[in-house]
Amino acid sequence: MPTINQLVRKGRQKPVYVNKVPALEACPQKRGVCTRVYTTTPRKPNSALRKVCKVRLTNGFEVISYIGGEGHNLQEHSVVLIRGGRVKDLPGVRYHTVRGSLDTAGVKDRKQARSKYGAKRPK
């Protein structure tokens, strides 16, 4: 615990805020074009082929975005909408593609949590 004299000399230091999604530039979502669609493997305890795409955003940033859900229709030059949200077991992936928006189709035959995957209500 500092003395009053130490506080007078130095003062308390504010914690430095680090932006977790710098490419969004304080916007909720951003549009971009896929430059590469590929699969990658997660970090140590997990094992899978995770679907990701490299996206060039309208503001010039180039980011890696995760494609959630089972199956997707994305390829190079697809126009996608990305939102913030990292994938814990994929290093460098800090964004998610929004399903059911622009060129990204919603997940087919999705019954639960449909709004997160752009699936329409089944008849």
Curated annotation (Swiss-Prot):
Pfam families, alphabetized: Ribosom_S12_S23 (PF00164)
Composition bias type Basic residues, residue spans: 113-123
Keyword Acyltransferase assigned: no
Gene Ontology cellular component terms for the protein in this record: small ribosomal subunit
Location of the region described as Disordered in the Swiss-Prot/TrEMBL record: 104-123
Keyword entries, A-Z: Methylation, Ribonucleoprotein, Ribosomal protein, RNA-binding, rRNA-binding, tRNA-binding
UniProt keyword rRNA-binding present: yes
Residues where 3-methylthioaspartic acid is found: D89
An example Gene Ontology biological process: translation
GO terms of molecular function: rRNA binding; structural constituent of ribosome; tRNA binding
Family the entry assigns: Belongs to the universal ribosomal protein uS12 family.
Assembly and interaction partners: Part of the 30S ribosomal subunit. Contacts proteins S8 and S17. May interact with IF1 in the 30S initiation complex.
Function of the molecule: With S4 and S5 plays an important role in translational accuracy.
HAMAP family given in the database record: Ribosomal_uS12_B
NCBIfam families in the record: rpsL_bact
Name the UniProt record assigns to this protein: Small ribosomal subunit protein uS12
Organism: Neisseria gonorrhoeae (strain ATCC 700825 / FA 1090)
